[in-house]
């Protein structure tokens, strides 16, 4: 696992229309409505090219990619704080961006990726898909790998056991359960469970006919 170094330049233009109608017109023009805030500066309403934003988020860093925004007044570094997508189409609806500076520590939700094969009798239950990590804004880690090779039922992996790259630190409950290993149901247990279903149904029918 290595720190995510992806950085993408993207042109931003000021937005002059607000509200739902203005946002719809912005999206129809192939742009994504966004708000840029942080560092004590007043919020700035901007629009970003949807195609460029999609390309940026397809890097290894995902939505944690460092964006260099090209504004009329100069460039700014920013990270996506909240990404809203259309529930059906998946297209971008709105983006909240937070200003960052090189060398500044920020907290970001980093994806957790399970790798390896557990013991044959083990059923793996991944409790969380992301974990809060504090790191330099320009060196946010990529996906954090959790190796489950050979793990047996009854084993758990906690947040404090995750291996983070140098310069990164956990910003979540250290006792948070990330992965839990359960025992697979045996064939006998599955058959017994299936065998109970008709009995329960028959009992229900019998009681209903009384």
Curated annotation (Swiss-Prot):
InterPro entries: Rbsml_bL25/Gln-tRNA_synth_N, Ribosomal_bL25/Gln-tRNA_synth, Ribosomal_bL25_b-dom, Ribosomal_bL25_C, Ribosomal_bL25_long, Ribosomal_L25_dom, Ribosomal_uL5_bac-type. This is Large ribosomal subunit protein bL25. It comes from the Bacteria. The keyword Transmembrane does not apply. Pfam families: Ribosomal_L25p, Ribosomal_TL5_C. It comes from Frankia casuarinae (strain DSM 45818 / CECT 9043 / HFP020203 / CcI3). PANTHER family: RIBOSOMAL PROTEIN L25/GLN-TRNA SYNTHETASE, ANTI-CODON-BINDING DOMAIN-CONTAINING PROTEIN (PTHR33284), RIBOSOMAL PROTEIN L25_GLN-TRNA SYNTHETASE, ANTI-CODON-BINDING DOMAIN-CONTAINING PROTEIN (PTHR33284:SF1). One of its GO terms (biological process) is translation.
């Amino acid at each position: 696992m290595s720190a995510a170094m992806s950085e993408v330049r993207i042109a931003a233009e000021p937005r002059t229309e607000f509200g739902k109608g203005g946002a719809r017109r912005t999206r129809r023009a192939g742009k994504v409505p966004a708000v840029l805030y942080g560092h004590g500066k007043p919020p700035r309403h901007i629009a970003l090219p949807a195609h460029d934003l999609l390309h940026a988020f397809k890097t290894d860093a995902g939505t944690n990619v460092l964006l260099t925004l090209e504004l009329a007044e100069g460039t700014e570094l920013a990270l996506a704080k909240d990404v809203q997508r259309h529930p059906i189409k998946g297209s971008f609806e709105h983006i909240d961006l937070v200003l960052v500076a090189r060398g500044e520590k920020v907290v970001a939700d980093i994806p957790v990726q399970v790798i390896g094969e557990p013991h044959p009798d083990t059923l793996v239950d991944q409790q969380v898909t992301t974990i809060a990590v504090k790191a330099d804004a320009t060196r946010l880690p990529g996906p954090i790998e959790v190796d489950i090779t050979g793990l047996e039922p009854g084993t758990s992996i906690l947040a404090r056991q995750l291996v983070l790259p140098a310069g990164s630190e956990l910003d979540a409950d250290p006792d948070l359960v990330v992965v839990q290993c359960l025992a697979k149901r045996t064939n006998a247990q599955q058959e017994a469970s299936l065998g109970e279903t008709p009995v329960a149904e028959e009992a229900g029918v019998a009681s209903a006919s009384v």
